[in-house]
Amino acid sequence: MRGVVKELNDDGFGVLGNVLVPFSAPGDEVEILKIEKVKKAKIASKWKLIKSSPLRVGARCKVFGRCGGCSLQHLSYDYQLEFKGERIRRLLGVDVEVIPSPRIFGHRNRIDLAVTVEGIGFRERGKWWKIVDIQECPVFGKTSRKAIERLREFIEEERISVWNVKKDEGFLRYMVLREGKFTGEVMVNLVTKEGKLPDPSKYFDFATSIYWSVNRTKSDVSYGEVESVWGREFITEKLDDVIYLIHPNSFFQTNSYQAVNLVKKVSELVEGERVLDMYSGVGTFGIYLAKRGFKVVGFDSNEFAIEMARKNAKINKVDAVFDVATDREVEVNGFDTVIVDPPRVGLHPKLIKKLNREKPEVIVYVSCNPKTFARDIEKLEYKIDEIVALDMFPHTPHLELVAKLIV
């Protein structure tokens, strides 16, 4: 089968007839050599590029096309933004500005590297059992090269057994790297099964903090029961004038440079004085707003996230209040603005009913999933007053939406 790729679907796959062509560009002339059926989709698992699209650029990553991390690195950044804007236009029927990421390489502040008999790196696209060995991750930056080199030395010199994914054997499973892009602080977290970890401190002497996490379950996860091995308990990140503590088991926006624009945009859309910060996490929005004089109350169902939010409030010397509660339990009356930043599944139906009943003046909806955002907007008795998209995830199809909703 031979032809010209017409467009990209929402997942960033090129479309040629009824076949999806990964890592292709609109305007590419391709010859499909092998097709595999994945669920209900036909995927070109092997294809040849006959003539390149003018939208193509050289990928900076040496393993691009195999690694499952980035899927759009072969496209010009201008076109990536155009593609994301068109995706939102198709979904919502409105033109939305897509704010570009201030940096498109070295922007990620976290990567979870599998440590296996095949190598150190990420899973191959569509193959959970295969790991693509890497020397450096360009979207994380130069610290990744140093950390991977030191990890190889640590494994070899200390004779550490590493993960055999297919057999589910081996001691050392993951290395999670986190970096404060505005502070330069680095955290190395080594994730293992039960056993004894040799002292890693001399190998990772560039790190601010070294942790050992033990995964005692059968689940394939890059976290566990944590123990501080060396250095500080937390690293820090700074967004404008706000400091945030980073712990191995706490969530933080993965693109620090664009996160500055995100918190600024949310603060611009807030009205009134009293703000309810739903799904507050570690207080990313709430503390930024409290620093600017808003009276903030935040809730999250994750106890550890709330513990971190309280610590962040304390170090920033703000009076924001954070408590543990589910989205179904929180009372929304008495607030001028309600911020909602739900997980990818979107808002709980009971919360939607509560918002429709109590009618806070303004809702600021932050979404990492445009599809569930569109679904929730249909159910909320509000209209979109302002909406913008932020490219938090360059070289992927994903983006963040921020909308101001009014009655």
Curated annotation (Swiss-Prot):
The active site is at residues 368, 400. [4Fe-4S] cluster binds at residues 61, 67, 70, 137. S-adenosyl-L-methionine binds at residues 253, 279, 284, 300-301, 327, 341. GO terms for biological process: tRNA methylation. Keywords: 4Fe-4S, Iron, Iron-sulfur, Metal-binding, Methyltransferase, S-adenosyl-L-methionine, Transferase, tRNA processing. Pfam families: PabTrmU54_TRAM_dom (PF21579), tRNA_U5-meth_tr (PF05958). GO terms for molecular function: 4 iron, 4 sulfur cluster binding; metal ion binding; tRNA (uracil(54)-C5)-methyltransferase activity, S-adenosyl methionine-dependent. It catalyses: uridine(54) in tRNA + S-adenosyl-L-methionine = 5-methyluridine(54) in tRNA + S-adenosyl-L-homocysteine + H(+). The keyword Mitochondrion does not apply. Its EC number is 2.1.1.35. The keyword Methyltransferase applies. It comes from the Archaea. Signal peptide: none annotated. Catalyzes the formation of 5-methyl-uridine at position 54 (m5U54) in tRNA. Belongs to the class I-like SAM-binding methyltransferase superfamily. RNA M5U methyltransferase family. NCBIfam families: rumA (TIGR00479). This is tRNA (uracil(54)-C(5))-methyltransferase. It comes from Pyrococcus horikoshii (strain ATCC 700860 / DSM 12428 / JCM 9974 / NBRC 100139 / OT-3).
